[in-house]
Amino acid sequence: MKILSWNCRGLGNQTAVDVLSHLVREKAPNVLFLMETKQSMAEMRRIQADLPYHCMVAVPSVCRRGGLALLWMVDVDLHVQIYSPNHMDALITKDNSFWRLTSFYGWPEEQRKHKSWQLLKHLHSRSSYPWLCCGDFNEILCMEEKQGQIPRPLRPMQDFKEALLFCGLADLGFHGNIFTWDNGRLGEDLVQKRLDRVCANMEWRDMFPHDKVSHLQVSYSDHFNINNRTTQSKKEKEVVKAL
């Protein structure tokens, strides 16, 4: 299964929609998570009509701010359990095994970042299923994940680390450029950060030990998209079924 997560920074012009369509054709994700769509429900329905996804749950933007959409192929057994302007929590069934997918968008405002970690901890309390959590967390874990301008204070990074530890989530790493966002400036004014990532608990990592995460650059948006590919061997499927 392929899962693609992208902070598209708005789908209000044809260029953005064309880039998205090309991305879907090229990478063929089974599940697509979009953040900051800046679209109404009706607008997202029109975009969906041009994509190969029969299923969608969307949170409309408010005054052209925010907006989420989770789209999936008809052959994916996915059921969204709860959602908000900052997340979508779904249960996926495959080969008689169950696992949980949380698509996450952290608060970008500095004074509200604590709400991201409160939400993450609340989601942790809802289920003990194998758990994959991906998206734009709007925070870094260490100074190596930022380049340019002044260093990030330690406290916000520590809060993020503590939230992941509390939830039993571990970063799955990546292939490609370490940074997933930049401010589009040049020279000394350029700032780059790793804001987007994929995390999972031990149960999920045991279920999908050959998972691969890639950072993919696109011509539109200041964010890379995150492509996550999950595979299970026949032996691993049998173990999961037996549990």
What does each of the following model-derived ranges do?
Residues 1-243:
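A shared catalytic/ligand-binding motif for oxyanion handling
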